[in-house]
Amino acid sequence: MDKRFAVVLAAGQGTRMKSKLYKVLHPVCGKPMVEHVVDEARKLSLEKLVTIVGHGAEDVKKQLGEKSEYALQAEQLGTAHAVKQAKSILGSEKGTTIVICGDTPLLTAETMEAMLTEHQKKAAKVTILTAVAEDPTGYGRIIRNENGDVAKIVEHKDATEEERLVKEINTGTYCFDNEALFQTIEQVSNDNVQGEYYLPDVIEILKNQGETVAAYQTVNFQETLGVNDRVALSQAEIYMKQRINKRHMQNGVSLIDPDNTYISPEAVIGRDTVIYPGTVIKGRVVIGEDAVIGQNSELENSTVGSRTVIKQSVIVDSEVGDDVTIGPFAHIRPDSKIGNEVRIGNFVEVKKSEFGDRSKASHLSYIGDAEIGTDVNLGCGSITVNYDGKHKFKTKIENGAFIGCNSNLVAPVTIGEGAYVAAGSTITDDVPGRALSIARARQVNKEDYAENIHKK
């Protein structure tokens, strides 16, 4: 197999987005457009991948990191000029180069692989990725001869009435013989209204030289969508969400309402897990089998074990074990680790804390900077007082301890193994194992005193 290379065009400013954010960094299902493109291209067994950057170059490099090499297009003078910037990296190579726009996040590796196969089969100097559009207005048309070969590409504004009836369009993705590409690109002129150097001119030059120009038609027009404004961005979001959700359902995950379920492209979900409407799964989330998530829950960069049930809750940058129940209305904040068979109930907030197996905080608690052992019960309204206004301190509750309702544990403090803290206590000192700690004022009953209050 010939060596393969890729050039991703990502230098345009994207003024139609009307945004401070560089166009190709706008996310689709939580992942920047250009990263979708690069990740799919990297599946093609490439020798080198070069991203052409311009506006926002440093931001793009920071996002993609070592996934790509980079070439700078300091002035945006057209697509051929952009590809030419990769000559110092690819110009001396032999093989096939695929050129992809960085604003086509829906393009798949499978389609690109099929295009490369067609390119090799036809022994072409260039192969154009085409699609059939129901409304081809604005697209360049693929005009074929009587043999079905590509005769020319005609831009919409230059097309005759007959040519405008053609629905096969140029998607802007190409395969080139690498040597032919970088030799011919030097011949491209900017003699046009915009004064720019256009990549389709390379195709025209090769065609005029008698070289083979092929086309591969994808059956999925949606895949070729270029995102140039917020309307197209929303369309790409819808198509990508449908693709992701379909993949999970085909892999054995039940989505009760796919149209109202948002799953990141990086998520991994086990079989027989059920996702209810309004669920948002962002970033690198891994969910085990037979879990139940929803409704209206948000998971971000976290792991969730098998058979765990999460209801109307938020989990961020944390680990949750097997057979856990969370919610409704719980918040698991970053750097928390929840063991197996744990119960985190309604209106419980956990921050940077670890819960051992079978421990419970069932109602109305704040647990921050804490290490909770196994089989611990935190009663309703239990609070770890972890902050003195300047510093955070740690609370440790050992195995089998019982914390009564409405208790305040003022850190740093340790509750020993099997200890009991009486309801309503404010604990400021360590409690030994097996001890009962009572830290509240003694109750005083004043007989008939209520009458004096009622008379006021």
Curated annotation (Swiss-Prot):
Q: Where is this region: N-acetyltransferase?
A: 252-456
List the active-site residues.
363 (proton acceptor)
Task: Give the pathway listed in the UniProt entry for this protein.
Answer: Nucleotide-sugar biosynthesis; UDP-N-acetyl-alpha-D-glucosamine biosynthesis; N-acetyl-alpha-D-glucosamine 1-phosphate from alpha-D-glucosamine 6-phosphate (route II): step 2/2; Nucleotide-sugar biosynthesis; UDP-N-acetyl-alpha-D-glucosamine biosynthesis; UDP-N-acetyl-alpha-D-glucosamine from N-acetyl-alpha-D-glucosamine 1-phosphate: step 1/1; Bacterial outer membrane biogenesis; LPS lipid A biosynthesis
A Pfam family of the record is: Hexapep
Which chemical reaction does it catalyze?
Answer: alpha-D-glucosamine 1-phosphate + acetyl-CoA = N-acetyl-alpha-D-glucosamine 1-phosphate + CoA + H(+); N-acetyl-alpha-D-glucosamine 1-phosphate + UTP + H(+) = UDP-N-acetyl-alpha-D-glucosamine + diphosphate
* Gene Ontology cellular-component terms listed: cytoplasm; membrane
Where UDP-N-acetyl-alpha-D-glucosamine binds, per the record, is at 9-12, 23, 73, 78-79, 140, 155, 170, 228, 333, 351, 366, 377
Q: Which GO terms describe its biological process?
A: cell morphogenesis; cell wall organization; lipid A biosynthetic process; peptidoglycan biosynthetic process; regulation of cell shape; UDP-N-acetylglucosamine biosynthetic process
Q: What residues does Mg(2+) bind to? A: 103, 228
Q: Which cofactors, if any, are listed as required?
A: Mg(2+)
Can you quote the record's cofactor note?
Binds 1 Mg(2+) ion per subunit.
Residues that hold acetyl-CoA according to the record: 386-387, 423, 440
Protein keywords:
Acyltransferase, Cell shape, Cell wall biogenesis/degradation, Cytoplasm, Magnesium, Metal-binding, Multifunctional enzyme, Nucleotidyltransferase, Peptidoglycan synthesis, Repeat, Transferase
Major site of localization recorded for this protein: cytoplasm
Q: Which residues form the signal peptide?
A: none
Q: For the region Linker, give the residue spans.
A: 231-251
Give the first-level EC class, as a single word: transferase
Localization of this protein: Cytoplasm
Picking any one GO molecular function of the record gives: glucosamine-1-phosphate N-acetyltransferase activity
Keyword Repeat assigned to the entry: answer is yes
Assembly description = Homotrimer.
Q: HAMAP family attached here?
A: GlmU
Family stated for the protein in its record: In the N-terminal section; belongs to the N-acetylglucosamine-1-phosphate uridyltransferase family. In the C-terminal section; belongs to the transferase hexapeptide repeat family.
Q: What does this protein do?
A: Catalyzes the last two sequential reactions in the de novo biosynthetic pathway for UDP-N-acetylglucosamine (UDP-GlcNAc). The C-terminal domain catalyzes the transfer of acetyl group from acetyl coenzyme A to glucosamine-1-phosphate (GlcN-1-P) to produce N-acetylglucosamine-1-phosphate (GlcNAc-1-P), which is converted into UDP-GlcNAc by the transfer of uridine 5-monophosphate (from uridine 5-triphosphate), a reaction catalyzed by the N-terminal domain.
Name of this protein? Bifunctional protein GlmU
What is the scientific name of the source organism? Bacillus licheniformis (strain ATCC 14580 / DSM 13 / JCM 2505 / CCUG 7422 / NBRC 12200 / NCIMB 9375 / NCTC 10341 / NRRL NRS-1264 / Gibson 46)
